Swiss-Prot record:
Associated with FCER1G. Heterodimer with CLEC4D; this heterodimer forms a pattern recognition receptor (PRR) against fungal infection. GO terms for biological process: adaptive immune response; antifungal innate immune response; defense response to fungus; detection of yeast; innate immune response; positive regulation of canonical NF-kappaB signal transduction; positive regulation of cytokine production; positive regulation of intracellular signal transduction. It comes from Mus musculus (Mouse). Residues 86-203 form the C-type lectin domain. Keywords: Adaptive immunity, Calcium, Cell membrane, Disulfide bond, Glycoprotein, Immunity, Innate immunity, Lectin, Membrane, Metal-binding, Signal-anchor, Transmembrane, Transmembrane helix. It is a single-pass type II membrane protein. Disulfide bonds join C64-C78, C79-C90, C107-C202, C176-C194. One of its GO terms (molecular function) is calcium ion binding. This is C-type lectin domain family 6 member A. It is found in: Cell membrane.
Amino acid sequence: MVQERQSQGKGVCWTLRLWSAAVISMLLLSTCFIASCVVTYQFIMDQPSRRLYELHTYHSSLTCFSEGTMVSEKMWGCCPNHWKSFGSSCYLISTKENFWSTSEQNCVQMGAHLVVINTEAEQNFITQQLNESLSYFLGLSDPQGNGKWQWIDDTPFSQNVRFWHPHEPNLPEERCVSIVYWNPSKWGWNDVFCDSKHNSICEMKKIYL
């Protein structure tokens, strides 16, 4: 009888140890999970601050607009002063003519790149800002002259999103692209020599706060 009670006592003690180990393990896992969430949340929340810090080296001030239709969706989309806002990007129309490579370098020095056009709506917005007597470099080029066009930010070149003028592109030696107004087809893309001088359009992603 005594042995049976001792055996039962050992069983209860062993069971308690198992439960204690399980509870401790769960607490440790929960703590690790919470810590991970906090680190991830902090990392995500820090992104606007880091981007703002980066832009501050190029621009002295930003203009921000309230975006979203509901209170819970409200956020601020910011662009540097004098840049145009559309969708998730900011655009700056250059007032100086330069070579394609120099134009890209000028954009990079402002935390941007030559414009990448992804939709017809974006093309239409951009052309509304342009002077019809000028042409503007885009961030599109064919470095090897083999007809493989590529965007400066490595966005895949889509055959469904292209706005060439009729009969363009027409020369393999013309390896860069400008957007220009030609009657009667209006605004469209034209392949040009990269060492010819044109105005340009810079693009950067908006900052969201």
